[in-house]
């Protein structure tokens, strides 16, 4: 009975693996471009997709781990265990990176996804939300990000922040049209 389930899980998992591999291949150069812009070319990022499927046929890997999986009560092998590995200078950002570097990675990945969507032909310019943008980032990175998104490539952007005094001069320096909305106790005002 488990053979049938595992065969199906492996067959569908391999399809997901292929789609993720193609997506990662497309995202990686965009991610590297945006991370380099955010860090002002001071750091060397890398992005790679790590999967059990890279070690051999997924069905055999899943079946080979069945005994251990039964003991612990869940599957240790399969597509659900895949990971998008992010490194800086060859070291995993998860273990070695600062909070600012980690946030820069996530923003670069978001910008890469945005770019990919924008050029996919399936949508016009997507709406971009940068939530709590300035938290954990130094002034240089914030400046790089705001200058980058202030151009015509990004369309409409929502930036949230908890400190209006910090936000106002940064936005004014872009010389772009913008509006600041205040949200206080659920009430929105200009």
Where is each model-derived feature located?
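Conserved NTPase motor "head" modules and their coupling/switch loops across ABC/AAA+ ATPases, GTPases
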Residues: 2-127, 136, 140-156, 165-174, ...
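Walker B catalytic acidic pair
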Residues: 131-133
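H-loop (His-switch) motif in ABC-type P-loop NTPases
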Residues: 160-162
């Amino acid at each position: 009975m488990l053979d049938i389930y595992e065969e199906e899980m492996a067959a569908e998992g391999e399809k997901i693996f292929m789609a993720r591999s193609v997506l990662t291949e497309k995202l990686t150069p965009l991610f590297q471009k945006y991370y380099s812009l955010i860090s002002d070319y001071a750091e060397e990022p890398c992005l790679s997709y790590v999967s059990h499927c890279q070690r051999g046929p997924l069905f055999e890997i899943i079946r080979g781990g069945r005994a251990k999986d039964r003991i612990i009560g869940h599957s240790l092998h399969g597509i659900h265990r895949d990971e998008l590995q992010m490194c800086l200078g060859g070291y995993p950002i998860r273990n070695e990176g600062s909070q600012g570097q980690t946030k820069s990675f996530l923003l670069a990945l978001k910008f890469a996804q945005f770019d990919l969507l924008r050029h996919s032909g399936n949508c016009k310019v997507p709406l971009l939300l940068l939530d709590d943008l300035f938290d954990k980032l130094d002034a240089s990175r914030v400046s790089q990000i705001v200058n980058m998104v202030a151009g015509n490539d990004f369309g409409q952007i929502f930036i949230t922040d908890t400190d209006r005094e910090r936000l106002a001069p940064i936005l004014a320096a872009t010389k772009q049209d913008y509006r600041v909305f205040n949200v206080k106790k659920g009430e929105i005002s200009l």
